[in-house]
Amino acid sequence: EVWVCGGQSNMAWTVRSTRDADLEVACAHDPLLRFVRMPLEARGAPRRDYVRPEHGGAGKSWRVIEPRSVGDCTAVGYYFAQRLRRRLGVPVGLVDVSWGGTLAQFWVSKPRLRQIASVAPMFAQFEGQLANWLEAGGEQGAQQRYEAALAAWQQARAAAAEAGDKAPKQPGLGPYQDPRTKRHPGGGYDGMLAPLRGLTARGALYFQGENNSFGDMYLPFPDTYPAVVAEWRELFGQPALPIGLIQIGGWSTRRSMTYDMNHHANVVREVQFDTWQRTPNTGLIVTFDLNSNSSIHPGHKRPVGERAARWALAEVYQQRGRDQRPLRWRGPVFSTADVDGGQVKVRFQEGTADGLRLDKNQASGFYVAGEDQVFHVAEARVVEKTAVEVWCDAVAAPVAVRYAWSNLPLGSLMNGRELPAYPFRSDDWPLRPHRSDSSYVRRAAGKGGR
């Protein structure tokens, strides 16, 4: 069973950097669980030949899971595959095509991207940067400019120290790098995915979206994120290739209600949710509840991999529990919100809210707003076993409810399997993320996913 693991840094995050590394690495022995990491390469045209990665030394492609190798393996992929191995008893191989800091358009072919109007500004920006970089001497010119900037900084630092002033910030390499790397639209597809054409993959996991939640990078995401699914299915010759979409978590700090309610991360999560809902043979794995330190790289990767494995075992492999019932992998999925006086009753998609509960019986992560569209923290309680009633004394006539809606979401709602509810909102009001000159308007979510 071969699974492709793609995305950015949270998929690239290795076992050695996780919270469980001190327990896991020393006892990792499984000759039937193997992985290969594709070399990080962005190209202007599809690579047709497969370059054997040198990550393991001795020219090896597949690396066997053992203490000396497991530290290099994608952590999410490892814990996912580990659960599949235990349940299915078959060999599992992971092909890691992740690269930290990448955008969704990095993993889609250029011909497909050229058909997406919202990506045109990114192409224009990239082509302009590349032309300027080449005109300025390419790699040699960049090295000379960086050395000059570094020398000027050293002089300024010495002068500041002599004057007792704060030292200036050291220049970074970013402005001097070849644009034909992570900023290259379609570059990752051409350099890392195209060589895999014809691979017989059982499915894929895709963990990406954080870099589309900065500035205006969210603007093409409603087009480029579902394009990844379509592109990968075409690449592997499987129109119904199962793809587990891993929803981004949260990071940084909450600042104000307006900041939280409009944050880019909400846009990304909503696009991920809507892509799942309208795309058959996909699953969406929640992660916002697994971040304990507000880092953009949460250290707990085992539960992410195991939740993804729940989806795969249930939907791809049709596995059942001890009671012969289908495995449950989804948390409560929003369905409807009905206003009754000063309260909003929220219902969920059938079969997702059995055993509905609030963690430690404490309501957290609920917000309501009236016609003024100003949100307030709300109270909530479980009613009728599978619904939740939400209210706020400061909002006499609520018209909208949101849950786990923030750059760093809170949320205590879960089902009886303790699978967290997906972030949701009942309104379709435009969002205006900070540091953005544009607004996001939700498209019709549609149906068709599972």
Residue ranges and their predicted role:
Residues 1-450:
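Cell-envelope and extracellular/periplasmic
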